[in-house]
Amino acid sequence: MLHEALMLEIYRQALNAGALPTARPRSTESANSSERCPSHDSNSSEHGGGAGSGGVGHRLDAAALSTGVMPGEGPTTLHSSFPAVPQSLPSQPPSMEAYLHMVAAAAQQYGFPLAAAAAAGAGPRLPLPLANEAAAPFKLPPQASPTASSNNSEALDFRTNLYGRAESAEPPASEGEEEEFDDGANNPLDLSVGTRKRGHESEPQLGHIQVKKMFKSDSPPANSVASPSASQLLPGVNPYLAAVAAANIFRAGQFPDWNSKNDLVVDPLEKMSDIVKGGASGMGTKEKMHSSKATTPQAASQPPKSPVQPTPNQNSESGGGSGGGAAGSGAVTKARHNIWQSHWQNKGVASSVFRCVWCKQSFPTLEALTTHMKDSKHCGVNVPPFGNLPSNNPQPQHHHPTPPPPPQNHNLRKHSSGSASNHSPSANVKNAFQYRGDPPTPLPRKLVRGQNVWLGKGVEQAMQILKCMRCGESFRSLGEMTKHMQETQHYTNILSQEQSISIKSGNANANSDAKESHNSLSSEESRTLSAVLTCKVCDKAFNSLGDLSNHMAKNNHYAEPLLQSAGARKRPAPKKREKSLPVRKLLEMKGGSGTTQEDHSNEKTSVQGKPGLGPGGGDKNDAALFAERMRQYITGVKAPEEIAKVAAAQLLAKNKSPELVEQKNGGSAKAAGASSVLSAIEQMFTTSFDTPPRHASLPASSPSNSSTKNTSPVASSILKRLGIDETVDYNKPLIDTNDPYYQHYRYTSSERSGSECSAEARPRLDAPTPEKQQQGGGHDEESSKPAIKQEREAESKPVKMEIKSEFVDEPNEAEETSKMEAAVVNGSATNNNNNIVERSSPKTPSSAASPQTRLLPPRSPAESQRSVTPKSPASSHKSYDGSSEGTKKFPSDSLNALSSMFDSLGSSGAGANSRAKLAAAAAAGGSESPENLTAGGNSLAALRQFCVKKEKTA
């Protein structure tokens, strides 16, 4: 740290100092000269041969030359050989001043009179800070006389001219003495202590150890032995400044004897170009360096100029030795010059430099490497992610460096490895991607930041992304994947994860037949998939979603569970609230326990075809089945035998019910009603609504418990009857109030009563013609026998599912038939007209209508009511006698309301206009009836009012 601090201080003072009257270096020439800043390799290679017995002498020569003194001459001939540098040179920059002062101090130490000239020229303007003895940066051993180097000038040629020195490869004779002399602490200080480290050569030549020690020795041991005089005289200097100064001084033509032979110093760029050219002299850089570390023939043939000619190289040595020379710092300067230059120059043989990073093949020249990279596509981004091809490849790429001969024969190596690289690698790389599963080889060492992107480390991730989801094949680029998709059509079925799992499991068992493969999928995944991919209609499992979809589309199995669950959602609402289970499971537990799949399908078809959720009009078995189902959903789970008994009891108790008053007046009406679907529904609901909770909460003397019941909320009353806890958040009524048809009737009866009443009743009230009045009277007086006969006729007709013509044609025919009946039946008693009309008035139009109407009988009595009531003239009279008769009809009103309610709930096929007309008719007479006033917006009250109007019409 002290050493660095001293160097920084020297540099700071050098910058602040004034300019000496020294010659300014020709910066352009020095900058353009090719011998700039020899590298560490060149220095180390040349120093090995030049460390002879005159080592101390050559260091003194270096010191003398760095100060401008010729080593062969004494102090007396200093100024005669060449003028003093400080006096003759113009002013220098502060860095040059610092260096010159340092050189002058070194000259003073060894008795050269240059210090006086420097002092005379520069004066005491630049005070030199004196370092303490422990940190003296420079150590010039004074063991030898200054004239010692003139005898060994050839051995002291440290020029970096590699080509010139290559011819004379004989080391000096007195290397052993110099090794002993310069070994240890007497080595000069390495000024490049803070710069990047150099890798040692594997087998250094003789004398090479000394040079390495000189450049790599630690500074504290060298400084500790420094003499006080040396430490006081030699300050620390920035090695960069010293190198620049020395190079500028000694290469800028300051010495007339130096004839500016630029080839003495090898420029790194020149070295690079020589390596690239691949010449024999340039390719043997390191080998010739190590084998021929001796003086150049130029120095040997010109002994008179030897004191001057080694100056650039001895200047380099003195820079390393005395701390201000160019070579020790010159290596540093060139290392800073370009990282790649030092990297290539430290590589050794060119074959180790030109190496393919992918196939690890070496090449003698850059041209061979470039050709190899072009042929084998081993360049950068497009490189395969796995450099090592599989072992079954006959000639793997990473074995290419082995076949060529040893690297001494560069031409043979060039041809052999070049040919091997030009043919086999390119052939092998074409098949590289057939082995995508091989583990990746380690990528080359990281040279620059972000090289992973270039060198293909991201290719592996890209291949994981660019993977066909069907066959799992990876691709290098999106284009290849697109081509694969187009060729294989693997994009047609975009598969989910489950589907891909099922496909893989199916492919694994593709050899066995379909059933065996399905049964053999024993993994947990396959079992789960089989459970999921099961047809809900036929309970058949499939391997893939595609098979299940094809099966459902082919067999139409997707419609059945949907419709069945849709019907189940409407009917077993209280049961679902009790259990809070899926509809299908509840159907299987309760309703489907005693029935087969055919029963469900029959029930489905009946639900589809009939508006009353019931089966056909003449089918007694379906009527009983439907009554059983409805009873079972409301009252709870019962055994099939119990359900049958309850259905029979309902059918028998219908004539005993106090609310079916019309059965007392017509004996045959009982038989007709017993066979109808509506009778079962009415009986079921009358019994359920006559439960003790209703009688306990309502007065028994009430004319109609069903109507007054509706003053309380529908949900709470029905839930109480069913015994369901109201604290549970199942506040839906028995009839699903969310049903669209139910909402329709509810809102039209309560909210649209005024407008609908005026719209529907106005045309009927405008012209109460005698014919209409006569019809009203006829309905009041008609007997029950014709009605019963007509009902039987209608129920014996075959069931038709069509609805369209019924609403289009039947109203007009209904008016005609009602008029005919009014004319025929005229003087009958009116005491039981209410109950008769409930049965007869609905059936009258359909029985007496045209043959087309007979082919399309209503699905239930309430259906005929719906079709007739909006258009029937008899309905216009409900406003006249509705107020007086409204209190008498409550028992049958509730039955009519419930039957029409179920009729409306099931009539998905009845058009919106028919429902609107029905609701309008219900609202027309709703305002006059007391039920509407008491019930308000209650849904059941609205439905009851609708049936009350039918009875009022009579």
Curated annotation (Swiss-Prot):
SUPFAM superfamilies tied to this protein: beta-beta-alpha zinc fingers (SSF57667)
Chief subcellular location: nucleus
Biased segments, Basic residues type: 568-578
Coiled-coil residue windows: none
Biased composition (Gly residues): 47-57, 318-328
Keywords linked to the UniProt accession: Activator, Cytoplasm, Developmental protein, DNA-binding, Metal-binding, Nucleus, Phosphoprotein, Repeat, Repressor, Transcription, Transcription regulation, Wnt signaling pathway, Zinc, Zinc-finger
Comp. bias (Low complexity): 417-428, 696-712, 842-851, 910-926
InterPro entries to which the protein is assigned, alphabetical: Teashirt_fam, ZN622/Rei1/Reh1_Znf-C2H2, Znf_C2H2_sf, Znf_C2H2_type
Subunit structure: Binds arm.
Miscellaneous comment in the UniProt entry for this protein: The tsh tio gene pair seems to have arisen from a recent duplication event: tsh has the dominant role compared to tio.
Function noted in UniProt: Homeotic protein that acts downstream of Arm in the Wg cascade during embryogenesis to determine segment identity throughout the entire trunk. Acts cooperatively with other trunk homeotic proteins to repress head homeotic genes and therefore repress head segmental identity. Necessary, in combination with Scr, for the formation of the prothoracic segment. Promotes eye development in the dorsal region of the eye disk and suppresses eye development in the ventral region in combination with Wg-signaling and several early dorso-ventral eye patterning genes.
The protein's name in its UniProt record: Protein teashirt
Organism: Drosophila melanogaster
